[in-house]
C-alpha cells in the first residue's frame, strides 16, 4: 500500500521572515553590490533564476549568513517574457515583451529583500535608506500578501 502525504496549510502560511520593499531603478547586480557594501552582506547571483510557470524568470541574489543563522534573498519584482507576435499587428513576425510581476499586488515595488532567521538585524532599515541608489525602502507584512508563496525560493 502507498502512503499518502499531505502538506499542512500552516507550512504554506509560514511568514517567519522579514520582508523589505525596495524602490530602485538600478540594475539588479548594481543594487546587490550596494546592499553588500552598505549592510555588510555577501549577496551573489544564484545559478538558477526563479521561474514562475513557463511565463517569466526573475533574477535572485542570495547569501547564507552562517554566523547569525540568517538567509538573505534579493528578488527582482519584474520579469519579461517574449510572446510570439499577435496577428494583425504592425509587426506580426516580431515577438513582443510581456511584463510579469513576482508579487502582482505590489507592482510599484522594484525589488524585495527577504531576511530569514531569528530577527532582523538592528538598524537594517536605516542602512537601507542610506544607500544613494535607493529611492525608498520600507518593511512589508508578508502575511498580508496574496502571492507570498512566490517568495519561497
Predicted features along the sequence, with ranges:
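Aromatic- and glycine-enriched beta-alpha-beta binding-site module
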Residues: 23-63
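Short, surface-exposed beta-strand/loop "edge" segments at domain boundaries and coil↔beta transitions
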Residues: 26-33, 67-71, 119-125
Amino acid at each position: 500500500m502507498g502512503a499518502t502525504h499531505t502538506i499542512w496549510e500552516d507550512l504554506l502560511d509560514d511568514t517567519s521572515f522579514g520582508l523589505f520593499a525596495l524602490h530602485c531603478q538600478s540594475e539588479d547586480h548594481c543594487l546587490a553590490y550596494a546592499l553588500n557594501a552598505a549592510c555588510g552582506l555577501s549577496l551573489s547571483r544564484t545559478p538558477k533564476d526563479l521561474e514562475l510557470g513557463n511565463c517569466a524568470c526573475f533574477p535572485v541574489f542570495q547569501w547564507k549568513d552562517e554566523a547569525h543563522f540568517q538567509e538573505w534573498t534579493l528578488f527582482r519584482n519584474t520579469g519579461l517574457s517574449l510572446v510570439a507576435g499577435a496577428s494583425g499587428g504592425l509587426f506580426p513576425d516580431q515577438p513582443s515583451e510581456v511584463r510579469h510581476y513576482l508579487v502582482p499586488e505590489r507592482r510599484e515595488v522594484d525589488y524585495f529583500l527577504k531576511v530569514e532567521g531569528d530577527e532582523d538585524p538592528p538598524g537594517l532599515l536605516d542602512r537601507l535608506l542610506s544607500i544613494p541608489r535607493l529611492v525608498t525602502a520600507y518593511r512589508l507584512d508578508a502575511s498580508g500578501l496574496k502571492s507570498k508563496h512566490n517568495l519561497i525560493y
